[in-house]
Curated annotation (Swiss-Prot):
Keyword Nucleus included in the entry's annotation: yes
A Pfam match: Trypsin_2
Active site: H119 (charge relay system), D150 (charge relay system), S232 (charge relay system)
Protein family: Belongs to the peptidase S1C family.
Residue ranges, annotated region (Serine protease): 81-265
Entry annotated with the keyword Acyltransferase: no
EC number: 3.4.21.-
One GO biological process term: proteolysis
Region annotated Disordered, chain positions: 1-46, 991-1027
Gene Ontology cellular component terms for the protein in this record: nucleus
Function: Nuclear serine protease which mediates apoptosis.
Protein name per Swiss-Prot or TrEMBL: Pro-apoptotic serine protease nma111
Gene3D superfamilies: 2.30.42.10, 2.40.10.120
Amino acid sequence: MDLNGDAGAKRKRSSIVPAERPAKHLKPESSALTPGDSTPANGTVYDIEDEDDASRLLPIGPAQADSPEWQATIEEVVKSVVSIHFCQTCSFDTELSMSSQATGFVVDAERGYILTNRHVVCPGPFWGYCIFDNHEECDVRPVYRDPVHDFGILKFDPKAIRYMNLTELKLQPDAARVGSEIRVVGNDAGEKLSILSGVISRLDRNAPEYGEGYSDFNTNYIQAAAAASGGSSGSPVVNIDGHAIALQAGGRADGAATDYFLPLDRPLRALECIRRGEPVTRGTIQTQWILKPFDECRRLGLTPEWEATVRKAAPTETSMLVAEIILPEGPADGKLEEGDVLLQVNGELLTQFIRLDDILDSSVGQTVRLLVQRGGQDVEIECQVGDLHAITPDRFVTVAGGTFHDLSYQQSRLYAIATRGVYVCEAAGSFKLENTLSGWLIDSVDKRPTRNLDEFVEVMKTIPDRSRVVISYRHIRDLHTRGTSIVYIDRHWHPKMRLAVRNDETGLWDFSDLADALPALPPVPRKADFIQLDGVSQPAASEIVRSFVRVSCTMPLKLDGYPQAKKTGFGLVVDAEKGLVVVSRAIVPYDLCDINITVADSIIVNAKVVFLHPLQNYTIIQYDPSLVQAPVQSAKLSTEYIKQGQDTIFVGFNQNFRIVVAKTAVTDITTVSIPANASAPRYRAINLDAVTVDTGLSGQCSNGVLIGEDGVVQALWLNYLGERTPSSHKDVEYHLGFATPSLLPVVSKIQQGVMPELRILNMESYVVQMSQARIMGVSEEWIEKVTQANPSRHQLFMVRKVDCPPAGFDNMADTFQEGDILLTLDGQLITRVSELDVMYDKEFLEALIVRNGQEMRIQVPTVPTADLETDRAVVFCGAVLQKPHHAVRQQISKLHSEIYVSARSRGSPSYQYGLSPTNFITAVNGVPTPDLDRFVKEVSKIPDNTYFRLRAVTFDNVPWVVTMKKNDHYFPMSEYLKDPSQPCGWRTVSHNKSKHKDGIAPDAANLNPDAMEQGYDGASDIEPEAE
């Protein structure tokens, strides 16, 4: 299914390429860049189509000094203009979760109403604040967002502004005229205040099309040359009298000084209704109209008689309203047709959007009569006027990690489809379909239809945890193609099914629990058989098929810098009786996860993590073999190291999960360390002998084995997660072989029922050749010993980096230093990586090294690996906090605290105020917080919706202070704690027990791992494999 094309909307295509299209003027939140940081832009950019006629622009020359009249006007206007900083906390309808800046202006100083754009007020959960000209700040909440037109109204408390006299701008929509000189006063380009001048060139422009996001329609727009940019959305367009005559909405993004303003007729009506305490009625017949000039209308069949009548009644008019899109199943379906020219409504000659809106808004639930001309024939129809608010979603449901609501009128109009269906606005968790964040329509779940949100909820209530059900779906961009998938319903990491309903009284979205999760059904043993390899001449390859299982790992939270929420690959069964499987740690990076194993492409069973190797990129997992009635075979692992030039058989799995076989030879065995990821430290293999082979299949296959003719496995073929490239922001993945003898000691202990408690040297090394070693002070005697001990590779190991000790501990004197050349450990000459294995069982090792040209003996401590794995995570204000994991200690020289920011959610306070991943938190409100316990204690004292100070240190050792506002409503604090007594191995705890008395962490959009970023270059671009 191709989901990367343009929106399939029924509208004319612009000849302008997307890069040249205009855009809305949101200013992506800079996230208060930390010293030494380069936090990415995180707003949403909207491209819009353009229908400019260059001959109609009235560009202005270089800015001249304003006249005294304009200066006096601006001095008064700026007192009413505010800078709005806001977030949409979760994806909803046309918008993704985001943080951004825009502009608004006070339109009622007594009641505290601010007018701004609808794309600022947001269709979904909103939180934000505004800053006045004198830098006073106050919270704002939404009062009204129009279902169609690009305006909304925010409310603030006038009593909160104590140091300036509030003033308001009068709305005067009838003062907008072609040739009028105007000023756009706002937060242009994210600046506190910018004043841009321009001249109105058009009053009859059709509403700009903003691509696949929100777009205004059924209104005319005003066009001017003002050159506004990001952050000016919602700015007042004022005339010399100081009256607001339009609302800044969008403009060209290609550098042309062209801007688009919304007329204020409908905002003025909405404001007056709100002032009177009346509902803002909005009527619709689910039809999009556009303005077309008389010459086009004549081609559509407008008769000369009607043209003469219209021109006589409205001499200044040059265009008429023409039906562009009629939604199926809407009031006008089967009555109006595309291309109908509107003549009259209720007997009144009508050529303008404003009057059409007037009639429809005052006729909700009533019938209107429309006279249109179709191909030269008069056609009169009657339509029932529907309620526009009724087809605009004001609620959503979160379940199994995904977020859903009824399909909106905005999306229906964009794609010309009926306004019904269940829309996936946040495709995550169980409902992450085909690596697309949103846009799915769910047709059925578990073979039951889901025509609307209520039906979907009722179906989901009946599905037990850990069930696998069939869902049928389509993407809104490609409704011709129906997809069918089997999804794994996760109700243990996401136990609550929660309903959020918009509350226009409070400006918040109220959450309620719909149903608890049904417990998982007990697993049932299944039978299966393995495939037979046709045409494969190597019997050993045919046998090894029975030792492979497919492994799928899903992470409910991003930890340890791992960039994905789901990964799939293959593992090798090393003990079929005990259900032990070895898999790459690039597939199972940590144990806060769900693991599903597929045996013989038929049987699916759950598995758990048994062992994570800290250095060599493998994880051992275990499934219940009693559930698998299939001839699974334990792979035989070689006890001898594979050698360069040795013949071998490569057996791997390609990108289609199909097994491939090739007879080949070992080209090289090289000591490597996977490159570190600069933007966000994450697990990587180091001090590793990597096997490469002479076949092109090795690069295509991420998992497999190298086996001999006797069927003995000589090496595992694993994928290794590497660095992210600065240019493409894509993660590099290496495919290398790992010799099995290094695996045997760990597997043997686990088979004996003993959990390996390895110890490691806290350093990373790399190979030095004898020419380098000689220059660095290694004696000829030792060089001779090296050549005799390892005839195939004359090498020693130099310390590249020493791991940072825990916070509060200084580097110990008797340990390695960068640049040390290692000669022996406990008297054994070290020329191979495998010889470093002596470190695993000893607390101290006696090392002979060459440092600064001098031989010396030191006693070096080893580090217990049990302390390196993450066992706790705190989610606070959208930031995932954890103890610095091993990769952090490998890449940093000093730990500033035990509180490391691992990730943050879009639309959260952490995102808004710039608490970036890879930062360390050292204090809260001046109180030192060296560890998570102290941090949780201090932040628990902070009341909701209150500012507090965090002292932080960047990864590059630059201290700074961030001020944040706590938001417990959308981002309550919760914890993930490792607990072997729990079925998942972890438990969740909420610190917001006043609202969640059961103590279980709430299922909230801020815990969606796909909405989290982990480094200053954003989220991963590696696409997870399709199931």
